[in-house]
């Protein structure tokens, strides 16, 4: 089966100068003849015309396909688009964000190795590092985000990988990625940056020195809370290693989900700025509210990472975390009184969502890990959608009114 989408055509390298919105809409395709919307190739396997054609596939002809777990035309189109928006040589799309993180780490470590990570990290990643990988002889150590720039002092002889998020989930700490990557590379560490909260529209970790960028496609890149997916982007050689691991682990992305992510990418540059505007508007309104002990948002000058965020990001993101003065009971009462914000896990979609980290992203983690991650029982994580800002503020203020 040949390529049905048209070849990538970029005479003179003109795409290198295109803006992020144009890149999100067009990916790396230019002047391709054929369907404007990417076809969904919903099949498990592909037929060959002859033994000679199969030999061409085995010799590396990328216009031929064998089995969707290995590669699929719709998924490959998404991978090209993801590489374009991240400024990467290549990308790999997989079944979920956790499939992406697991694939990346497993492709880089073996028994006896150690993974270093920020203490403020998504709960699923923490469980991967503390519950699953130790069964196979891979250790993990967690360091405060503020200490990561000195990772060269913390790394040991067994250390192989560093995992960071910026902004972090859900505390919204900002990591100086350029400084951290330089320090990590001084000790030979491979740096994986979870860029889910920032999106490639606001932050380009590869340009700041990261080796691999990871995304939960479920979130802002797809943008509509209707699919689950994940991705890695980076140098071609590292993505090839991750792809070989994915083929064994089996976490391939469904072609229909790939189509939906492609559609979501086309409006990324329209959705994310609106979410950033809504988040900043809400954060400013709530700073100083008597029922709110802290407002965590990198766009506020009071945020400790504000200056770093201004330097390495083009916007501050659509996530705001509140720490309520009354602890978990107050957070649960506030949560129950919300009307516009959906009470749901996940983030980054067009609809605004509210979650309690101790009950969702970090549920079940031991107390010491919660403390290390800076998780307060009174935290409420808000994912701002694209609704009218005044309506969102009114909803939050009415939910806080009784506190």
Where are these predicted regions, by residue range?
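N-terminal "arm"/small-domain region of PLP-dependent enzymes with the aminotransferase-like
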Residues: 2-72, 80
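PLP-dependent enzyme catalytic core of the Aspartate aminotransferase-like
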Residues: 3-13, 130, 139, 336, ...
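Conserved C-terminal alpha-helix-loop-beta "cap" of PLP-dependent enzymes
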Residues: 30, 294-380, 384
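Conserved N-terminal alpha-helix of the aminotransferase class I/II PLP-enzyme fold
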Residues: 50-99, 124-131
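Short amphipathic alpha-helical segments
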Residues: 63, 89, 228, 257, ...
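Acidic-histidine catalytic/liganding microenvironments
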Residues: 85, 286-290, 338
């Amino acid at each position: 089966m040949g390529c049905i989408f048209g070849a990538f055509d970029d005479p003179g390298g003109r795409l290198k100068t295109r803006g992020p919105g144009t890149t999100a809409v067009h990916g790396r395709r230019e002047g391709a003849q054929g369907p404007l919307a990417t076809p969904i190739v919903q099949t498990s396997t592909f037929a060959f015309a002859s033994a000679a054609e199969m030999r061409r596939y085995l010799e590396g002809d990328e216009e031929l396909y064998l089995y969707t777990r290995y590669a699929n035309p719709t998924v490959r189109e998404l991978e090209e688009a993801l590489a374009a928006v991240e400024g990467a040589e290549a990308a790999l799309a997989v079944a979920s964000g956790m499939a992406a993180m697991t694939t990346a780490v497993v492709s880089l470590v073996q028994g006896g190795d150690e993974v270093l990570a920020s203490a403020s990290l998504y709960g699923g990643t923490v469980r991967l590092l503390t519950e699953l990988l130790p069964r196979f002889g891979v250790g993990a150590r967690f360091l405060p985000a503020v200490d990561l720039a000195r990772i060269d002092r913390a790394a040991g002889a067994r250390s192989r990988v560093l995992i960071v998020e910026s902004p972090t989930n859900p505390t919204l700490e900002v990591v100086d990625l350029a400084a951290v990557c330089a320090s990590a590379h001084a000790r030979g560490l491979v740096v994986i940056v979870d860029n889910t909260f920032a999106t490639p529209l606001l932050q380009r970790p590869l340009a700041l020195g990261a080796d691999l960028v990871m995304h939960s496609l479920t979130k802002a890149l797809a943008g509509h809370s209707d699919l689950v997916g994940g991705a890695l982007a980076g140098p071609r050689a590292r993505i090839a290693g991750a792809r070989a691991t994915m083929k064994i682990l089996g976490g391939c992305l469904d072609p229909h989900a790939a189509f939906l992510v492609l559609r979501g990418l086309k409006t990324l540059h329209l959705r994310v700025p609106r979410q950033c505007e809504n988040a900043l508007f809400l954060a400013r309104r709530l700073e100083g509210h008597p029922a709110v002990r802290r407002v965590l948002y990198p766009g506020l000058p009071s945020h400790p990472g504000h200056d770093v965020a201004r330097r390495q990001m083009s916007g501050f993101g659509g996530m705001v975390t509140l720490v309520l003065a009354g602890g978990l009971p107050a957070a649960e009462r506030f949560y129950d009184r919300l009307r516009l914000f959906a009470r749901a896990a996940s983030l980054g979609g067009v609809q605004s969502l509210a979650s309690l980290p101790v009950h969702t992203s970090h549920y079940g983690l031991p107390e010491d890990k919660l403390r290390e991650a800076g998780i307060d029982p009174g935290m409420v994580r808000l994912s701002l959608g694209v609704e009218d800002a005044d309506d969102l503020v009114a909803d939050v203020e009415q939910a806080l009114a009784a506190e």
